[in-house]
């Protein structure tokens, strides 16, 4: 992994205990950036521009309750072979719900990356469009991988995220994520949840043809390792 900076964006009015916790966890691995007022793509562009020393830049968004795989950044950097403006989307991910882990291939997932030239201009950054509208701004390169590249946590406080994946064994994530996966995979409970999940997905596909098109795009994505 090369030329990578992890920026943790926080509200300028964040409490002292929160700042202290971030400083304790950092160990030099990320930079905390205070944001005053409303945050948008313009604010993100200014933040990135102040730290930029290269002719092009890649920006990826990750929510603070989600995670990316150990090789996520390296995979994205390998795929960005030119400064041509486009989004790179690693299709294969997973969701963590109250009962377990669920496989979730999704070509419009929130973990998308924008590649763009930034020599004499303010970077647009990945925040220029919402992730499900990315193709309206620039071409999208969808790539598949042999393991989940991102982990989305589905919980009661996240009203915009729906648990729609197919149950998978939590141990498949262990080598790729540096976080504890708090769930068990008992045979009966796993089989029941897998069956119910498959039925739920089938119902969604029948009830929404656009979801079938989305699944087809995900399955047809190019393998990242062949680039």
What feature does the model see in each segment?
Residues 1-7, 28-31:
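Short loop->beta transition adjacent to catalytic acidic/histidine clusters or analogous donor-positioning motifs
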Residues 5-9, 87-90:
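A structural signal for short, well-ordered beta-strand segments and their strand-loop junctions
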Residues 6-10, 59-63:
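Extended hydrophobic secondary-structure segments that form protein cores and membrane-embedded regions
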Residues 11-58:
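Active-site-proximal specificity loops/subdomain of glycosyltransferases
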Residues 14-18, 96-98, 159-162:
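Short catalytic/ligand-binding loop motif for oxyanion handling, primarily in non-cytosolic enzymes
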Residues 32-34, 59, 87, 140-143, ...:
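Conserved beta-strand scaffold positions in the cores of enzyme catalytic domains, especially
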